[in-house]
Amino acid sequence: MTQNFFNPVTTQTWTNGRHNVRCVKVIQETWDVRTFCFMADQPVLFFFKPGQFVTLELEIDGEAVMRSYTISSSPSVPYSFSITVKRLPDGRVSNWLHENLQVGSELVVHGPVGDFNVIDYPADKVLMLSGGVGVTPLMSMTRWFFDTNANVDLQFVHSARTPRDIIFHRELEHIFSRIPDFRLHIVCERGDESGEPWAGFRGYLAQAMLELMVPDYLEREIFCCGPTPYMKAVKQVLKSNGFDMSHYHEESFGATPADVRADVEELAEQAEAEMEAVDTADMLQVEFSNSGKSIRIMPEETVHAAAAKLGLHIPKACGMGICGTCKVKKLAGEVTMEHNGGITEEDEADGYILSCCSTPKSHVAIEF
């Protein structure tokens, strides 16, 4: 790569949107987890908030597929970014990435987006709680704290199934060995089948264990990411001890595609059953300016559902207002948007909405 690649005059800054990137490195983190590192062909500074995520635009067996992954790298290393992916037995996308994505592969990403980050919630004392591959956004935050010499009292508690499942193990130990105010605690559900010894905490994270590791956990800003049962257990401990939940922040993995399809089918059946009971005067018109198509929909139906009924395909990944993939511009009218961090305040001010979680309050016009 030539020195001109890093010319600050020609270097662009990453903004929320659609970008072409190329895989430049693949790292085997554990037996079933890989990190994929990306750069742009034209120099781009990948600025984002530690904890945010991107959505990959892929083609698998001839079908367009969108999937969101947290950025595991730190914005303090701005010319590239990384995602860390666990290979799931029935995971269509994760298996495809592990089998097909290699150095030189090109793809499209959308983002960065997400409210789960340490920039918007600064604190002097931080507790990070992660389970399994939920360590990825917290690793981005930890790398950021380390690289920027942040004056933060950080306690990090990570739970893994076995010692060989500990993601970023060596790097975490390196980081926490060099900063006096950083403390690392690792919990393994059990030892390795190979018999590898594990002298650390064993079992599942519980109140007694948390109190032993982090006695002042109720005084900290808490960032949590992991499987739903893990986060549910964490919240139960916190709430039962009077923790102020305004200082608790979490990132979940969301529903699986099968769950989303089941929800869609259930809602479609419900909508059909209720159609006869709806006064047509209550229905609202949704117009799509680029296609010249419009449709009247029932109250509480989303802009995305309106587009689908017209045969218009607005890209979508999570279906829950998290990933930001379905962002479109509203030209007229009012909507109610109940998102989960997938859109910035700046984009909202500019008239953008997330079609998957926006329901019209009046007749609306959409640029699509």
From Swiss-Prot:
EC number(s) given by UniProt: 1.14.13.251
Domain of life: Bacteria
Mutant lacking the gene: phenotype: Can use glucose or dimethylglycine as the sole carbon source, but is incapable of growth on glycine betaine as the sole source of carbon.
Keywords recorded for this protein, A-Z: 2Fe-2S, FAD, Flavoprotein, Iron, Iron-sulfur, Metal-binding, Monooxygenase, Oxidoreductase
Gene assigned in the entry: bmoB
Known catalytic reactions: glycine betaine + NADH + O2 + H(+) = N,N-dimethylglycine + formaldehyde + NAD(+) + H2O
Protein name per Swiss-Prot or TrEMBL: Glycine betaine monooxygenase reductase subunit
GO MF annotation, one: metal ion binding
2Fe-2S ferredoxin-type domain span: 284-368
Cofactor: record remark: Binds 1 FAD per subunit. FAD is the native cofactor, but activity is slightly higher with FMN.
InterPro entries according to UniProt: 2Fe-2S_ferredoxin-like_sf, 2Fe-2S_ferredoxin-type, 2Fe2S_fd_BS, Beta-grasp_dom_sf, Cbr1-like_FAD-bd_dom, FAD-bd_FR_type, Flavoprot_Pyr_Nucl_cyt_Rdtase, FNR_nucleotide-bd
Subunit structure: Monomer. The system is composed of an oxygenase subunit (BmoA) and a reductase subunit (BmoB). Maximal specific activity is obtained when the ratio of BmoA to BmoB is 5:1.
Stretches assigned to the FAD-binding FR-type domain: 16-119
Positions with a binding annotation for [2Fe-2S] cluster: C318, C323, C326, C356
Activity-pH behavior: Optimum pH is 7.5 (for flavin reductase activity).
Cofactor: FAD; [2Fe-2S] cluster
Keyword Metal-binding found: yes
UniProt keyword Iron-sulfur, yes or no: yes
TM helices/strands, residue ranges: none
Family named by the database record: In the N-terminal section; belongs to the FAD-binding oxidoreductase type 6 family.
Function: Involved in degradation of glycine betaine. Part of a Rieske-type oxygenase system that catalyzes the conversion of glycine betaine (GB) to dimethylglycine (DMG). This subunit is the ferredoxin reductase component of the system. NADH is the preferred electron donor.
